[in-house]
Amino acid sequence: MLLDDLYEIVEPITADLGYILWGIEVVGAGKLTIRIFIDHENGVSVDDCQVVSKEVSAIFDVEDPISDKYVLEVSSPGMNRQIFNIIQAQALVGFNVKAVTLTPVESQTKFKGVLERVEGNNVILKLDDGREVSFDFDELKKFRVSPDFS
């Protein structure tokens, strides 16, 4: 699978450069956009993104993991970061989040609340109305931090 191949190539590069690979997203049809999200304990600057982009581009030119034309984007995950895996979810317990499920849960697919806890591969949200709802992480289409600025 393309995404697995990209992780295998990109993760060692980011680690060697001192960054955490937060996630990779592949979007579009025809001309793909490859989005690489990096993090660092001291934050991520535009210069950091340029360094990673240059190194990844050089390796992609050699390894050629994508046969079609593509656009490469490197950025920080940002404040409203997407949560790519259960380990990231565990680290974000207590944060406000938004979730979109692949199939309806309690007749809805969009949820907003506090990430209350993680149990195995399940994430439990406390919704704004006080209810708790549980999702298998693999059933989430989108899952991201939703900063509260109030």
UniProtKB/Swiss-Prot annotation:
InterPro entries: Ribosome_maturation_RimP, RimP_C, RimP_C_sf, RimP_N, RimP_N_sf. The keyword Cytoplasm applies. One of its GO terms (cellular component) is cytosol. It is found in: Cytoplasm. Keywords: Cytoplasm, Ribosome biogenesis. Coiled coil: none annotated. GO terms for biological process: ribosomal small subunit assembly; translation. HAMAP family: RimP. Belongs to the RimP family. Required for maturation of 30S ribosomal subunits. This is Ribosome maturation factor RimP. It comes from Francisella philomiragia subsp. philomiragia (strain ATCC 25017 / CCUG 19701 / FSC 153 / O#319-036).
